[in-house]
Amino acid sequence: MPRQVPIEKLRNIGIVAHIDAGKTTTTERILFYTGKTYKIGEVHEGAATMDWMEQEKERGITITSATTAAYWKGYQLNIIDTPGHVDFGVEVVRSMKALDGIVFVFASVEGVQPQSEANWRWADRFGVPRIAFVNKMDRVGANFFGVYEDMKKKLGTNPVPIQVPIGAEDNFKGVVDLFNMKAIIWEGDELGAKFEEKEIPAELIDLAQEWREKMIEAIVETDESLMEKYFAGEEIPAEDLKKALRKATIERKLVPMLCGTAFKNKGIQPMLDAVIDFLPSPVDVPPVKGANPNTGEEEARHASDDEPFCALAFKVMADPYAGQLTYFRVYSGSVKAGQTVYVSNKGKKERIGRILRMHANQREEISEVYAGDIAAAVGVDATTGDTLCDEKAPIVLEKMEFPEPVIAMAIEPKTKSDQEKLSQVLNKFMKEDPTFKVSVDPETNQTLIHGMGELHLEIIIDRMKREHKLEVNVGKPQVAYKETIKKKATAEGKFIRQSGGRGQYGHVWIDIEPNQEKEYEFVDKIVGGVIPKEFIPAVDEGIREAMNQGVVAGYPVINVKATLFDGSFHEVDSSEIAFKIAGSMAFRDAMKKADPVLLEPIMHVEVDTPEEYMGDVMGDLNRRRGRILGMEKRGNTVTIKAEVPLAEMFGYATDLRSITQGRATFVMTFERYEEVPRHIAEQVAGQRSKANA
């Protein structure tokens, strides 16, 4: 199948915003006006096309990025709708890799809200050009110019209004296009499909003139030849201004600003024009870079059908009909259905069964996909972040970095017979979502699920019930403590049992000492056969078993060296089990004498916060037994680096949200284990013995 749309006419865009700024409604309108849907879906009715998971329809929020292709004036738009809730930030990060441009949707009343700020920073990190759409202009308190000031102040960016609103609140009728100085008016309720160009209302001429001047000044500052014309007093044609604004937008010097009300069907078509006019095609962005797995050398792939095939799997989903769907962005070359590709970061081959072009949860089968495009593959065993490429020209693209899960809770099936099913379902969710992790607590043997927040885990539990008919019980969050020793100690372990018939006899002497290099080391110093060779591994096994449960609070023991140096045996009664028990007894006794302590995980925490909340955030980290390591200022944002015990970090996402009105974000990674202060260790031991009583 030959290429349907030239690569220059492709636009891979994300629609990003804070929760409730009207992003999904905006996407619905785009699909309606581009002819992809015949009936407009309303989010508050649970009918939106892009919100296709059951939980999304109920909650009215977008959880997974649905992707869809739409067509406008001969251009193909691949649109990714992303969630605005902080617990699902991973979806935004994940889709940034596949995008070339973003439409940031801001609510006209609230302006720049927390998650938009966080997502703006991610877009900065990934270097994605963007335009701004101020939505909900029909609401009471709508203030387009207020959002303009907000963007400058909170995002430290350079917004350029290319429209001004006509009216506001109930009287919002349309916009003035500042390039050709015409009013665009939506009259009547033709679902917004019809609009007229008129002369600018008399009362708005001065305002429009003032903002047109500001727009021209901002644009010519980025282009020397236009600046010369401007200062010479020449009239600059609208086309030249647009061309210069396109270049400045792609270079991330300026952000074109538009407005409308998606719900009332006004302002969407000019915004689609702006996507085409100002956001980049795959050819306009820098080539993607990666490493050749054979040589380790850096290589680049340009957006061209003639280069070797290279793509990134940016999302994996289980589909009720097709099995696993792997969404991928093609950076170079092309791939056909039925072709075998190389998953270079895993060194394995995969056959692409079918290729689908997605429209929310509907699909169209295509035979080939080319450079710059986005599609979904059926039958490929891949995970998020995998590189798919041509085996003859291998490349591994930069790994996707995801924030670490910050909350964990115990989970078990309501019926024992569902244990196997639970394991399968958890594995499936881990494949789909890189921020969802599963572990087993060796102490309690409980399965723990880890995620980005309570809503994240709630939705996973809900999906188990709905999609897999799996009922589970969940517990409260918990910390994985460990124990160790601070000094050397010696102890004897003697196990003798005489009870008719053959007895049991095992006798050992051991030294234990702190060992920072290894979690556990066993040294055999037996000489002269005082303990026969065949019983020595049993002593080691007995010590290991005893280390599963320390003497402070019953947590696993780490960083210990044990030396077996003496003992005795009985010709008839000695056995492996007797020496294993003797080893365990000796270890427990030695540990009590070796100054045992409780250890807790210390986390490295980085908080990105607007400057005005810096003092409150630092005060809060100090109250959590945190140590502040330093601070870094970036624009209006401060990054605070600290080390904080994990035990103090439960509920932090929620607390940080309330301290900073949700405008701060944080990333937490494990640093090391450290001794717990004595008074806290006593509390932990007390709670542990109560729980196990």
UniProtKB/Swiss-Prot annotation:
PROSITE patterns the UniProt entry points to: G_TR_1, G_TR_2
One Gene Ontology CC term in the entry: cytoplasm
Compartments where located: Cytoplasm
Function: Catalyzes the GTP-dependent ribosomal translocation step during translation elongation. During this step, the ribosome changes from the pre-translocational (PRE) to the post-translocational (POST) state as the newly formed A-site-bound peptidyl-tRNA and P-site-bound deacylated tRNA move to the P and E sites, respectively. Catalyzes the coordinated movement of the two tRNA molecules, the mRNA and conformational changes in the ribosome.
Spans traversing the lipid bilayer: none
Pfam family of the protein (one): EFG_IV
Keywords in alphabetical order: Cytoplasm, Elongation factor, GTP-binding, Nucleotide-binding, Protein biosynthesis
Any GO BP annotation: ribosome disassembly
Highest taxon above the source species: Bacteria
Official protein name in the record: Elongation factor G
Main localization (coarse): cytoplasm
Domain tr-type G: 8-283
